[in-house]
Amino acid sequence: MPNVALFVTCLSDTLFPSVGQATVELLEHLGCEVTFPFEQTCCGQPAYNSGYHEETKKIAKHMIETFEQADAEYIVGPSGSCVMMMRDYPHLFQDDPVWRPRAEAHAAKTFELTQFIVDVLEVTDVGAKFPAKATYHASCHMTRLLGIEAAPGKLLGNVDGLTMVPLANVHNCCGFGGTFSVKMPDVSVQMVDEKVDSILQSGAEVLIGADASCLMNIGGRLHKQGHPIKVMHIAEVLNEGVKQA
């Protein structure tokens, strides 16, 4: 039985707890033993992107120590963006002979949820059933930096009753970009409006994504414009399907 420490991420922990819960239930359904290190905090990405690299190192050290104490075989998180930051910890400590090997060990066992299910557990069909017409938003960090493109599609393609429709300009950023949406709101709004237009043109009833930050941004814009499109994290889709199956 694989032992997994849940990296819940800030947004799942504070704003979208159903994503964290779905992640745990899904992993347990797939035979994993899941633990939750309560001392975990933010991964440090907002600070890093804002240029506070020394402060980010303090956060990274705390996260490395926290998950070392958990002593799990794997660290799994429902966010490509946050997992990417944890995978990049060795870069923060590239000139530190003490912390670099610890950061490398930490990064090596850290996985995004769909990547872990498909590549590590070698599962592409979780037995889900979710009748809906949906489209998938591919988040930037997950595809461009982690290189995860096939895994979400493999899992969603095997969900009974789920019809996936293509999304135009699927690799275009949604405009969130962490602190980017705060620093450059006018540009961010234009970007998310383009994403919303693509979603509407797809004819989908449900928008699925693997990063809560993107879903929060796109979902907020859909709601503001009065569009009744449901927004769901891929963990919720797969888990709800498992519950119905």
UniProtKB/Swiss-Prot annotation:
UniProt-listed GO biological process terms: lactate metabolic process
Pfam families for the chain: CCG
Molecular-function GO terms, alphabetical: oxidoreductase activity
This protein's GO CC annotations: cytosol
Domain of life: Bacteria
Role according to the record: Is involved in L-lactate degradation and allows cells to grow with lactate as the sole carbon source.
Cited HAMAP family: LutA
Family: Belongs to the LutA/YkgE family.
Protein name (database record): Lactate utilization protein A
Organism this protein belongs to: Exiguobacterium sp. (strain ATCC BAA-1283 / AT1b)
Lineage: Bacteria, Bacillati, Bacillota, Bacilli, Bacillales
